[in-house]
């Protein structure tokens, strides 16, 4: 726990998946509901291209408005977790942080993170990748670990593992892009044996 009386929680949202806006909306709900008397909250957004930035603690800025979702945008700063220590630092760049000639002109220590609450959806959020980063940083986090996240993200692998453990699963067929391109008709024959309707899930 940090030196202050409340543990510090890092709320992580946005991300590189197609569900970026949904993640921002989820964060708005969490930031509204979380008990500020018990938690010291730091909102951290990840842009669509994977940049980590500190975001204003304003749930209304992350909610859907007139049916339109919100996105995390980056300025001249970036945020990072230090490996093995779990400290959060904010780097200020001169000029465009993404430019090859840019350089760091300021570093602010934001303190130790006690726990991370990831609200990311899809790739780079639910597939074990960011969970592995938290493990390397030595920070506790909410949700499944690296292995279970990676297995659960791949529906074919999930069913294979469950079936191997003796757990009943529904019948399924895996159709790869290569198989479909080579012989779509044969793929359809396999699918039709399942009986319709069927659920189609990219894995």
Task: Describe each PLM feature range.
Residues 2-13, 17-18, 24-25, 41, ...:
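Active-site nucleotide/adenylate-binding loops and adjacent lid/helix of ATP-dependent enzymes
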Residues 17-22, 33, 52-53:
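Short N-terminal binding/cap micro-motifs at the start of the first secondary-structure element
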Residues 22-29, 126:
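Conserved alpha-helical elements of sugar-nucleotide-dependent glycosyltransferases
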Residues 26-39:
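A short, Lys/Arg-enriched amphipathic alpha-helix followed by its capping loop at the start of a domain
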Residues 40-48:
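A short beta-strand-loop structural module common to alpha/beta enzyme folds
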Residues 46, 54, 58-135:
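N-terminal glycine-rich "phosphate-gripper" loop used for MgATP/nucleotide binding
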Residues 132-150:
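Short, acidic/small-residue loops that bind anionic groups at enzyme active sites
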């Amino acid at each position: 726990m940090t030196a202050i009386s409340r543990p510090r929680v890092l709320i992580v949202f946005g991300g590189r998946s197609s569900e970026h806006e949904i993640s921002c909306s989820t964060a708005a709900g969490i930031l509204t509901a979380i008990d500020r008397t018990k938690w010291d909250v730091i909102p951290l957004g990840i842009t669509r291209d994977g940049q980590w930035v500190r975001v204003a603690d304003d749930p209304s800025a992350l909610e859907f408005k007139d049916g339109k979702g919100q996105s995390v945008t980056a300025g001249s700063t970036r945020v990072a977790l230090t490996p093995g220590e779990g400290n959060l630092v904010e780097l200020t760049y001169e000029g465009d942080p993404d430019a090859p000639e840019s350089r760091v002109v300021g570093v602010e220590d934001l303190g130790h993170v006690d726990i991370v609450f990831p609200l990311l959806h899809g790739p780079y959020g639910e597939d074990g990748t960011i969970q592995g980063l938290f493990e390397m940083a030595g920070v506790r986090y909410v949700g499944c670990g690296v292995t279970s996240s990676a297995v659960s993200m791949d529906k074919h692998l999930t069913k294979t593992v469950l079936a191997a453990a003796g757990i009943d699963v529904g019948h399924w067929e895996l159709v790869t892009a290569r198989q479909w391109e080579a012989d779509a008709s044969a793929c359809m024959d396999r699918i039709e044996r399942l009986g319709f309707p069927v659920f189609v899930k990219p894995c």
